[in-house]
């Protein structure tokens, strides 16, 4: 069979269990008997969420972005260091050779299109499913949201991408060319408009992990921010805030305490729901990489390997509670105090900083229960602050939005009387303190085109020189995908 540019997988089942079907191009005959009742429609949308889990459990969306930025870095080993050193090529040759594909942008491309494919089938088939009409609309709205999220994930990583809005039912319709970035965003906004119309408002009785109308509004706001549609970003961020459906968790530490993740749901608009069981469907392994080797406070099976730059650690305002999840020492399982210089003797850098956002002392080996947060209410406030400043300058409203986040961090209100640009810069800094380790910072640097000046200043003994160039704003489209799709062209800077 001809190799497809997208790996196409459909999961079916009548419970939370999922069965992967043989990889193949779909036909109408192949799917004619599915989506015929409510149970199958529910199974189909559950599979869409499950496919997204496959992307995030690998860590690729975090690692590809965070290791390129100025907050966290990986242990300097071959294959893992190419993102931090900007030494990858269009074929991701080193990652392929040294078994690091699951940490690379290749995984983002593959998993995003798997999820889009499954969402497309829901959008195409479920509207005709005989079932409760309200729930049917909700399911289709969830699929529109997920398709928008994946297209947005792709475009912020790769720039111009293939927009895929129809399910694959032949080999021929997999040979599709790229759309411009503007065209991609048009599709994203169209999908999110439909999602908002079909999704319900959030309530505390929501099924865990499901998206709401407010989730679609916040994703719309964030996509508009990236697309520099400031008024649109402001309108949608304000809609989330003004709905009062979500509230900030009072304690930043509680927000990232695995045992309190039900409490955290009051702030989380979209996440990947995970657990610490040996069930391979919903394991979390993100915590495994951030924990020092042998620390029951972090988890029961951590290997270490991802650390925080000391420059970022030292950037916090005195008393900022967000810094409490960073540490320069730890106590190991034997009860021995481990000082900063001995955190990881494999590295040349001796001013290592540990990150505790993904601690899980009740982990089962490599499996933790930390959910992965993709959209939370703090983002709505900071998007509103930045967008308001672009539209109306450093207004009282702009200050009120950013200070809401600073209040939770227990730091003073932002200095009054800032210029428009100084306020926007302060908002970007606030985002850095708020969302470190959540796969966000690199995109703030690239969308503002500040990565070329910021990154070279963030170095250490293991990465003494870091020199991104203009082409690093977007990752190259994996060469294997271009080889499989005659209509797909590489990004101009990577040809």
Please report, for each region that a protein language model flagged, where it lies by residue.
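Bacterial Sec-dependent N-terminal signal peptides
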Residues: 1-27
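Long, intrinsically disordered, low-complexity segments
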Residues: 16-18, 23, 35-38, 54-57, ...
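Conserved, well-structured interaction surfaces
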Residues: 37, 42, 46, 50-56, ...
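Flexible, polar/acidic helix-loop-strand segments at domain edges
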Residues: 83-98, 314-376
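TPR-repeat structural position
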Residues: 230, 394-395
């Amino acid at each position: 069979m001809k190799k497809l540019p997208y790996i196409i997988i459909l999961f079916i089942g009548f419970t939370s269990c999922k069965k992967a079907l043989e990889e193949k191009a779909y036909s109408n005959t192949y799917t004619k008997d599915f989506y015929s009742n409510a149970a199958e429609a529910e199974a189909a949308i559950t599979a869409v969420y499950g496919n997204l889990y496959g992307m995030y459990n690998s860590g690729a969306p975090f690692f590809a972005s965070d290791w390129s930025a100025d907050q966290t870095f990986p242990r300097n080993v071959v294959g893992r260091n190419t993102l931090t050193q900007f030494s990858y090529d269009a074929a991701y040759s080193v990652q392929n050779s040294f078994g690091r594909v699951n940490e690379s942008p290749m995984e983002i491309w593959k998993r995003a299109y798997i999820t889009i494919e499954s969402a497309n089938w829901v959008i195409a088939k479920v509207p005709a499913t005989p079932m409760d009409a309200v729930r049917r609309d909700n399911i289709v709205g969830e699929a529109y949201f997920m398709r928008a999220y994946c297209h947005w994930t792709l475009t912020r990583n790769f720039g111009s991408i293939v927009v895929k809005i129809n399910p694959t039912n032949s080999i021929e319709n997999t040979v599709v060319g790229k759309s411009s970035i503007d065209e991609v965003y048009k599709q994203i906004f169209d999908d999110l408009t439909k999602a908002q119309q079909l999704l319900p408002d959030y309530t505390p009785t929501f099924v865990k992990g499901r998206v709401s109308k407010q989730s679609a509004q916040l994703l719309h706001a964030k996509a508009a921010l990236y697309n520099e549609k400031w008024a649109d970003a402001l309108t949608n961020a304000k809609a989330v805030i003004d709905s009062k459906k979500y509230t900030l968790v009072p304690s930043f530490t509680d927000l990232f305490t695995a045992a309190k993740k039900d409490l955290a749901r009051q702030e989380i608009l979209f996440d990947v729901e995970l657990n610490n069981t040996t069930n391979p469907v919903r394991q979390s392994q993100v915590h495994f990489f951030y924990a020092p080797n042998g620390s029951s406070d972090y988890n029961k099976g951590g290997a270490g390997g991802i650390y925080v730059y000391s420059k970022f650690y030292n950037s916090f305002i005195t008393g900022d509670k967000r810094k409490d999840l960073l540490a320069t020492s730890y106590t190991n399982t034997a009860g021995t105090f481990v000082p900063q210089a001995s955190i990881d003797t494999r590295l040349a850098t001796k001013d290592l900083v540990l990150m505790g956002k993904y601690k899980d002392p009740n982990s089962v080996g490599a499996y933790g229960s930390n959910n992965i947060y993709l959209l939370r209410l703090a983002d709505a406030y900071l998007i509103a602050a930045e967008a308001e400043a672009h539209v109306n300058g450093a207004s009282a409203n702009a200050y009120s939005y950013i200070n809401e986040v600073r209040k939770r961090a227990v730091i003073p209100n932002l200095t009054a009387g800032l210029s428009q640009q100084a306020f926007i810069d302060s908002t970007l800094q606030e985002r850095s303190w708020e969302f470190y380790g959540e796969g966000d910072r690199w995109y703030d640097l690239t969308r503002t085109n500040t990565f070329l000046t910021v990154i070279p200043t963030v170095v250490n003994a293991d990465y003494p020189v870091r020199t991104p160039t203009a082409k690093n704003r977007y990752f190259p489209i994996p060469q294997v995908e271009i080889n499989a799709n005659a209509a797909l062209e590489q990004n101009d800077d990577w040809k």
